[in-house]
UniProtKB/Swiss-Prot annotation:
One of the GO biological process terms: DNA-templated transcription
Pfam families the UniProt entry points to: RNA_pol_Rpb2_2 (PF04561), RNA_pol_Rpb2_3 (PF04565), RNA_pol_Rpb2_6 (PF00562), RNA_pol_Rpb2_7 (PF04560)
Native species: Nicotiana tomentosiformis (Tobacco)
EC numbers on record: 2.7.7.6
Protein encoded by which gene: rpoB
Compartments where found: Plastid, Chloroplast
Identification of the protein by name: DNA-directed RNA polymerase subunit beta
Length: 1070
């Protein structure tokens, strides 16, 4: 619980609550709704009827545990059983059976699903809400054209537009337009009914010509005209039943189904009272929409803001899973229908269990979790990453936008985002503004709208009442901003406060305020809420910081931050990284892998996570926090997880930093560090890599795992056990064999080596015909083997291979090339590691740990790091930790600066160190050069900020190529570290080389080292024998490719050679 002295205490909702509520809604309501839609199925003679009994469905508890599902690469799911009856109409007999129709993946306590052993999470999607929206655009003459766009529940669009002559046209899927009268008549109305149900009948009559009267003379004529325009069919189509069915299927079902949300929006926008269960577009809707369009043409009514959140809806986990379940039932219906017909045709007696198969449901969910863009692999770099991933909101995905086509207006911040979508936390790059993050107090309402909480201000009641308002409701209230929270209640009536009303910011008297914010963090996401002094930072740098905190690597020795915001504990609790006591009891036994808790007459075993690999190769490990014999309360922390300390999030380290230049080593965001950070393992982290190999059954026989591998040196096989698998605890280096494997192959007599043929002829020894296909350790993979898993699945077929996985632990100290960052977007690369005696040192003799460039602060406008830096120094000297809510200027002016200076002054007094706070230059201190012992000319800001080590590490990035593969078409080296590719020399690199006049290097880059096939073959030979490298005479392959491509366009390219002797032009073919 967090609160302010003058406000009611508000509890921050669970950060995974959005996922839990969505999945529970799917299980409670979505399953039943879709099962009720399953139709009764009859055979062609209508003698047999198949019917589901929805009330009796049941979900069975999973047969395996979560850990086993991850270990064995299985899906953590529940079996769904449904009862059905087969009714013979002639005899009125019914056969009822309960059968299994498929597996539904379940959600675990982290808000994720485990599919094939992989943690996956479903992202919430923002879509345009179904309904009608009015907007105006300027035509080529500069005249406003008003249109009304009707969006169906499936995303189909139809438009109504009014022209300069006040004629109303309907445009379906951007094709030819038809008159509104033809559309209304095709939907079943005659002319009299149309004129009776509109507000402006004279306008409708004004564009009713004789030709138009003939088109709407009867419903059949209107349908034919509409079909001709809609389907772009030439000639004169004839009215028929099949034509009506085609029109019904292509137009009315796809573009006229509004759904419950669409019907509600349509009724509100057009002031209609059509029942909610009538979810299709009616002629009454079309006529009311046309009336509103006419009103807009003559200056009555308001246009819609398409980017307002009241016109958006959230497609949550429940909606996505329900859609997939409905799709699976449609497939199941087709299977049942086909099976019934087949059984009757072959004169077999069907049973309900024989008619139904579990394949449609199981395969539908497998393909959804594996292939759908909104189903993503959970990012588990650190605990914060896990929570934030589940709270993302995406405009992308099926039915949504794309990064290439989305406009700036859609990406921009909208006033309706206040308290619902974080204005800071979004992706960088092409998806900026399209992938956002939920504000910490936001929740998804019943109708798919984002709701935000407010306190109601009432004169009658002194109590505090909290309301959750949708985006369409809060714009009718005067909402006081966050800086009015701490006003004195005795004089509130006399004060003037800033407020928000109808997307505008006003300054009004306190008595006019209806609602007020409940919390300073209300409008931020979790990532942005963890940045102290965020109000002093530029928003771009805050965005970088909220993204970079998710890239922080869990360190071997975590440390909680001195300066925080207070949300660190809540983030750690909801991340699932901690081991929490589920009940009261006493600890009777502790070990590195489990805790035994005695209580209520039995003993509960709580397993701990030990050296578990995340999908980003970071190490997830739980450390015991309770001694044996201690009594535990329910909810108490038993063990800390990765990147947590004492139940609080701990992503980095508090290190001593100076802001000053140092010999150019920290220019352009480079960072200079002390060797203390290496030798004392301050920034040491553990990483676990997984290596995997499968054994198949080939056409020549099964592959064999063995430690007897011919033609391999003994030292490469030294770590294998008798089964041919590396032993636990072994230290392995690059090139070592992890799993020995032989694959059988057919070898012809002629392909044997001479010595093998001799052995066969003289001694009769059968030479091995197997090929060595061992699992070898790749470059940069050296480390300690901590786990080996041999997963054997039932049936040793080639489709179900055995899998052997080897997990290797690496210990990585911080080194040159690693990336570090603060919490204010101040990131940098380690440029040099200095001996601690050469680092600048303070007046008390302590050497600095890091040196940052001061030029990185003023231009980036992230001054919050200076406040954090100085307050961190005071906290380390006073042994205090600070938890500061953002926007503390609401208490008084310059509140942040006063707090920092007062703490520095107190630290100076208590520690008797006057250099900590010097009035001439507060916050700065004179420090000394470690190499000479002389003081620097200017005082320098020193402090203890919280610095993170990011996952962008030099061990994963650095790469060199001596030889490798070439692309077949261009004959140039492949691209990328994974393919052992080469460096690409682009235009700008060539310019740089040209600037220095290095002609030979340029020639090598364009020929030998790139795509000149003959020249690079000759280089090897001349290098070996020591001759001079010949100059290439013909063109490289890329030039030859260009010539061929031009020839494919019927362009012949020739070139001319100018003789040096007589300058005669000799023409040669390319």
């Amino acid at each position: 619980m967090l609160g302010d002295g003058n406000e009611g205490i508000s509890t921050i909702p669970g950060f995974n609550q959005i996922q839990f509520e969505g999945f529970c809604r799917f299980i409670d309501q979505g399953l039943t709704e879709e099962l009720y839609k399953f139709p009764k199925i009859e055979d062609t003679d209508q003698e047999i009827e198949f019917q589901l009994f929805v009330e009796t469905y049941q979900l069975v508890e999973p047969l395996i545990k979560e850990r086993d599902a991850v270990y064995e690469s299985l899906t953590y799911s529940s079996e769904l059983y449904v009862s059905a009856g087969l009714i013979w109409k002639n005899s009125r007999d019914m056969q009822e059976q309960t059968f299994f129709i498929g597996n539904i993946p379940l959600m675990n306590s982290l808000g994720t699903s485990i599919v094939n052993g992989i943690y996956r999470i479903v992202i919430n999607q923002i879509l345009q809400s179904p309904g009608i929206y009015y907007r105006s655009e300027l035509d080529h003459n500069g005249i406003s054209v008003y249109t009304g766009t009707i969006i169906s529940d499936w995303g189909g669009r139809s438009e109504l537009e009014i022209d300069r002559k006040a004629r109303i046209w309907a445009r379906v899927s951007r094709k030819q337009k038809i008159s509104i009268l033809v559309l209304s008549s095709a939907m079943g109305l005659n002319l009299r009914e149309i004129l009776e149900n509109v507000c402006y009948p004279e306008i409708f009559l004004s564009f009713l010509s004789d030709k138009e009267r003939k088109k709407i003379g009867s419903k059949e004529n209107a349908i034919l005209e509409f079909y001709q325009q809609f389907a772009c069919v030439g000639g004169d189509p004839v009215f028929s039943e099949s034509l009506c069915k085609e029109l019904q299927k292509k137009f009315f079902q796809q573009r006229c189904e509004l759904g419950r949300i669409g019907r509600r929006n349509m009724n509100r926008r057009l002031n209609l009272d059509i029942p909610q269960n009538n979810t299709f577009l009616l002629p009454r809707d079309i006529l009311a929409a046309a009336d509103h369009l006419i009103g807009l043409k003559f200056g009555m009514g308001a246009l819609d803001d398409m980017n307002h959140l009241k016109n958006k809806r959230i497609r949550s986990v429940a909606d996505l899973l329900q859609d997939q379940f409905g799709l699976a039932l449609v497939r199941l219906e087709n299977v049942v229908r086909g099976t019934i017909c087949g059984a009757i045709r072959h004169k077999l007696i069907p049973t309900p269990q024989n008619l139904v198969t579990s394949t449609p449901l199981t395969t539908t969910y497998e393909s959804f979790f594996g292939l759908h863009p909104l189903s993503q692999v959970l990012d588990r770099t650190n605990p914060l990453t896990q929570i934030v991933h589940g709270r993302k909101l995406s405009y992308l995905g099926p039915g949504g936008l794309t990064g290439r086509t989305a406009s700036f207006r859609i990406r921009d911040i909208h006033p309706s985002h206040y308290g619902r979508i974080c204005p800071i936390d979004t992706s960088e790059g092409i998806n900026v503004g399209l992938i956002g993050s939920l504000a910490i107090h936001a929740k998804i309402g019943h109708w798919g709208s984002l709701e935000s909480p407010f306190y109601e201000i009432s004169e009658r009641s002194t109590g505090v009442r909290m309301l959750y308002l949708s985006p369409g409701r809060d714009e009718y209230y005067m909402v006081a901003a966050g800086n009015s929270l701490a006003l004195n209640r005795d004089i509130q009536e006399e004060q003037v406060v800033p407020a928000r009303y109808r997307q505008e910011f006003l300054t009004i008297a306190w008595e006019q305020v209806h609602l007020r914010s409940i919390f300073p963090f209300q409008y931020f996401s979790i990532g942005a809420s963890l940045i102290p002094f965020i109000e002093h930072n530029d928003a771009n740098r805050a965005l970088m910081s909220s993204n970079m905190q998710r890239q922080a690597v869990p360190l071997s020795r975590s440390e909680k931050c001195i300066v925080g915001t207070g949300l660190e504990r809540q983030a750690a609790l909801d991340s699932g990284a901690l081991a929490i006591a589920e009940r009261e009891g006493r600890v009777v036994y502790t070990n590195t892998d489990k805790i035994l808790l005695a209580g209520n007459g039995d003993i509960l075993s709580i397993p701990l996570v030990i050296y578990q690999r995340s999908n980003k190769n970071t190490c997830m490990h739980q450390k015991l926090q309770v001694p044996r014999g201690k009594c535990i309360k329910k909810g108490q922390i038993l063990a800390d997880g990765a990147a947590t300390v004492g139940g609080e999030l701990a992503l980095g380290k508090n290190v001593l930093v100076a802001y000053m230049p140092w010999e150019g080593y920290n220019s352009e965001d480079a960072v200079l560090i002390s060797e203390r950070l290496v030798y004392e393992d301050i920034y040491t982290s553990f990483h676990i890599r997984k290596y995997e190999i499968q054994t198949h059954v080939t056409s020549q026989g099964p592959e064999k795992v063995t430690n007897e591998i011919p033609h391999l040196e003994a030292h490469l096989l030294r770590n294998l056990d008798k089964n041919g698998i590396v032993m636990l605890g072994s230290w392995v280096e690059t090139g070592d064999i992890l799993v020995g494997k032989l694959t059988p192959q057919v070898v012809k007599e002629s392909s044997y080596a001479p010595e093998d043929r001799l052995l066969r002829a003289i001694l009769g020894i059968q030479v091995s015909t197997s090929k060595e296909t061992c699992l070898k350790l790749l470059i940069g993979g050296r480390g300690r083997v901590i786990d080996v898993r041999w997963i054997q699945k039932r049936g040793g077929s080639s489709y179900n291979p055995e899998t052997i996985r080897v997990y290797i632990l690496q210990k990585r100290e911080i080194k040159v090339g690693d990336k570090v960052a603060g919490r204010h977007g101040n990131k940098g690369i380690i440029s040099k590691i200095l001996p601690r005696q050469d680092m600048p040192y303070l007046q008390d003799g302590r050497s600095v740990d890091m040196v940052f460039n001061p030029l990185g602060v003023p231009s980036r406008m992230n001054v919050g790091q200076i406040f954090e830096c100085s307050l961190g120094l005071a906290g380390s000297l006073l042994d205090r930790h600070y938890r500061i809510a953002p926007f503390d200027e609401r208490y008084e002016q310059e509140a942040s600066r006063k707090l920092v200076f007062s703490e520095l002054y107190e630290a100076s007094k208590q520690t008797a160190n006057p250099w900590v706070f010097e009035p001439e230059y507060p916050g700065k201190s004179r420090i000394f050069d470690g190499r000479t012992g002389n003081p620097f000319e200017q005082p320098v800001i020193i402090g203890k900020p919280y610095i993170l080590k990011l996952i962008h590490q030099v061990d994963d990035k650095i790469h060199g190529r001596s030889s490798g593969h070439y692309a077949l078409v261009t004959q140039q080296p492949l691209r990328g570290r994974a393919k052992q590719g080469g460096q690409r020399v682009g235009e700008m690199e060539v310019w740089a080389l040209e600037g220095f006049g290095v002609a030979h290097i340029l020639q090598e880059m364009l020929t030998y080292k790139s795509d000149h096939i003959r020249a690079r073959q000759e280089v090897l030979g001349t290098t070996i024998i020591g001759g001079t490298i010949p100059n290439p005479e013909d063109a490289p392959e890329s030039f030859r490719l260009l010539v061929r491509e031009l020839r494919s366009l019927a362009l012949e390219l020739n070139h001319f050679l100018v003789s040096e002797k007589n300058f005669q032009i000799n023409r040669k073919e390319a």
